[in-house]
């Protein structure tokens, strides 16, 4: 009974309090000292210093507040981040109150602004190089190895998230093409302010609205490395087990808005560097003759140590690289290089075999000597505008190789091995592209010629049969392609038609104490292909899909007039479908899925029926049967 009475008294008290409160409404406008309305000002009614109602002003600076209060006066508070806070006491019955706020005067403290290490703007990712480079990272190549997502391989090739780059720029200009080791090895890291990764990269300006899977690198230079000649020079000396050690190198460079120049020179016997400076990462082995592929390189097994720990090198290298802009869209590039590499080393290799009773020991002592001369030349003209893209690139490379590998077996039998060959390659690649209304047109022409005038491997072995293997080769290739692309909204349909003719001649002769045989293979190959493809790109470039099929017919005519004569003529027709899907999950996360069916036939190597011997214990030949293979590939890449 007592509990019910207390509950009744409590409810009565609450009802009396509620009846005592009155409902009020307050409206008004908040403006600055110039009478301009202030948006998003915080307006509060406080009672006993506690807010009982609040709101924000609209774009016209007006506000409206409804609240309940038992008091005759309340506190009105108005605040804004850019204005001084204002508080005033008003009568509860007041229905309208306009407020003027004074601008806030803030004394800024002294701060130090630091640039972020990585900046993402659209498809461009910029690394501030000084944030990652270490104290011992003298060259650009050393510093780039520390950038997250970027990989620099032992050969100097650059990958981003596992994908090879398609272009290397210095201040937006393509000075070096695929020979960008010249830049990464010779430009000091402190000359570079940032390294930019260009995703969705298009070399041609006319393709700016086309989604691409290519990635490129652009180097941004510091102010003291631009607009005036700069250079770096270094000299090192010391003593080693075989005498004096030295290395001298220098690089002169000039980077201007219309011209770039980079010249280098190195000589030394401390480490190998000549072949590294001369690598073209975009040509690969396109200018390597067939004869070199037959003979290979004479070499011994490697010691289980880093190569630089046991070799005695002597290298020279020089390069001259010039890019000149003829106009806003036209440029001419010249790259000349020369590499000389000489390397000697001695190496002992023992192998132990046991059967539980006796132990057999095989002891090999190698003394290798290798010499290479390699000159290179590239000349490229480019016209790159919004309406057309024209490039003509002439490339040439030569290799003069001499290799010796005397070997002693079990401290008694001596084997003398040596190899010598000359290899030459030339190519001219012309590409013309333009667009008209809804069509894009493309014409391309590739001419290449490779030859190995003479290559020889000689092996003499005391008490055992010796041999001499010689080879020479010539190969001419002509590829012509015409393509039309129809564009409609987010879709494109490609219609490329291609023609390729290849003529080859390979001669090889093997002479041993008890055998003599040779190959004289002539081959002609004619290909026609039509490869239509459909492509759809999401309007916001969220994803890209491609599907196509290659319809190709090939005519081959191979004949071996050597020791084992053989002739083969054949027409073949193949269908190779493929698809590709790219999805941009975020600006830095991409998923790629691609698949293809490939139906390929063999080549001239299938008709080399007389033996080819490239070492004392290795010999190979073909059966004269044209190979055919079919494969299905499916790749999924997340990066």
Tell what function each PLM region has:
Residues 27-39:
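Structural motif
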Residues 21-22, 35, 60-62, 84, ...:
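Membrane-proximal, glycine/serine-rich, low-complexity loop/turn segments characteristic
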Residues 208-210, 274-280, 344-361, 402-413, ...:
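Outer-membrane beta-barrel translocator domains and adjoining extracellular loop/strand segments
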Residues 48-50, 75-88:
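A short, solvent-exposed loop/turn motif at the edges and junctions
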Residues 50-62:
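Short, acidic Ser/Thr/Gly-rich low-complexity loop/linker segments typical of extracellular
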Residues 36, 64-72:
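Short Pro-Gly-centered beta-turn/loop motif in secreted/extracellular proteins
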Residues 451-453, 504-505, 555, 587-630:
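Surface-exposed extracellular loop regions of Gram-negative outer-membrane beta-barrel proteins
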